[in-house]
Each structure stands twice: as structure tokens, then as C-alpha cells.
């Protein structure tokens, strides 16, 4: 299980690095990932990841050729599995925040509102890709967080 978590963290870090749009070579990406603590990464692995996630080289705002990820895919459809639309679930001591694919927040929020108080959800506010969840009892926010994560098979 630890290996899977490490792989998930690597993917998240890899995507974050590419979003910076400042790495022009695979070796620069390797160095950046190694600086983040992924010592077993090499150019071959980076090459496979770039291919897997559809990364392309393009010009950034400074007109430098850099690797970047393609824009998010289109608006979710009714056939989109809901668990694939949830990108991140996090919380502080008062609120749970769910990040979704663009356009999916209201759909997910409606589902969460339908579950309601029995599962610890007082209410939601949804934008385009972010949902704020107010727990019905702040002392039980961890339990509500587990419920929300389990709904979408979210393991992080």
C-alpha cells in the first residue's frame, strides 16, 4: 500500500512541476523531482510519465520551450464516473474542501447535499471546480471527511 501512495504522490508532484511551465528538458524534470525527494527517478521514467499524461513541449509566457500538460478535458458528462471527477479532498478544523474537474463541482455538491445530515454534511457551496462542505458537527469533521473520501474511493 505504501508503494501505491508513493506513486500517487509522485504523480501529484510531477503534475505540479509541469504546471510551473519552466522545465525545457527531461533532465531538468528529473532534477526537480529528485529535489522533491524522489531519488529513484530517472530520465526513462520521466519520459514514460510525459507520454502517459500527454505532456507536450510548447512556448511559455517567456517564449521558452517547456513541457506542460494539456488543458483539462471538457465538461463532464452524465456518463462520467463521479470518482474520476474528484481530484482532491482536504480539510481544516472547520471545513472540507473538494476540488473537482472543471464544471463538475455543482454535480458533486448536489450528491453531497442529498446525503445530508445523517452523514455529517450540513451543507455545501459549489463553484465551477471547488466545493466547500460545512460539517453538521465540527467535532466530528474527521468522520465526515472519511465519509466524503469513501464516496469517491479517494485514498489520499
Curated annotation (Swiss-Prot):
Location in the cell: Cytoplasm
Gene3D superfamilies reported for this sequence: 3.30.1360.40, Winged helix-like DNA-binding domain superfamily/Winged helix DNA-binding domain
Single Gene Ontology BP annotation: protein complex oligomerization
GO molecular function: arginine binding; DNA binding; DNA-binding transcription factor activity
Pathway assigned in UniProt: Amino-acid biosynthesis; L-arginine biosynthesis [regulation]
Pfam families the record matches: Arg_repressor (PF01316), Arg_repressor_C (PF02863)
Family, per entry: Belongs to the ArgR family.
NCBIfam families documented for this protein: argR_whole, PRK05066.1
PANTHER family: ARGININE REPRESSOR
Protein name listed in UniProt: Arginine repressor
Natural source organism: Shewanella woodyi (strain ATCC 51908 / MS32)
UniProt lineage: Bacteria, Pseudomonadati, Pseudomonadota, Gammaproteobacteria, Alteromonadales
Encoding gene, per UniProt annotation: argR
Amino acid at each position: 500500500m505504501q508503494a501505491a501512495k508513493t506513486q500517487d504522490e509522485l504523480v501529484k508532484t510531477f503534475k505540479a512541476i509541469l504546471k510551473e511551465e519552466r522545465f525545457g528538458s527531461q533532465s531538468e524534470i528529473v532534477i526537480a523531482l529528485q529535489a522533491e525527494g524522489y531519488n529513484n527517478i530517472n530520465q526513462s521514467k520521466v519520459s514514460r510519465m510525459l507520454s502517459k499524461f500527454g505532456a507536450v513541449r510548447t512556448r511559455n509566457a517567456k517564449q521558452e520551450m517547456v513541457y506542460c500538460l494539456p488543458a483539462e478535458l471538457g465538461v463532464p458528462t452524465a456518463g462520467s464516473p463521479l470518482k474520476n471527477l474528484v481530484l482532491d479532498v482536504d480539510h481544516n478544523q472547520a471545513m472540507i474542501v473538494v476540488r473537482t474537474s472543471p464544471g463538475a463541482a455543482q454535480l458533486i455538491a448536489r450528491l453531497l447535499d442529498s446525503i445530508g445530515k445523517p452523514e455529517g454534511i450540513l451543507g455545501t457551496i459549489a463553484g465551477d471546480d471547488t466545493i466547500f462542505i460545512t460539517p453538521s458537527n465540527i467535532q466530528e469533521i474527521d468522520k465526515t471527511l472519511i465519509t466524503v473520501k469513501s464516496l469517491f474511493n479517494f485514498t489520499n
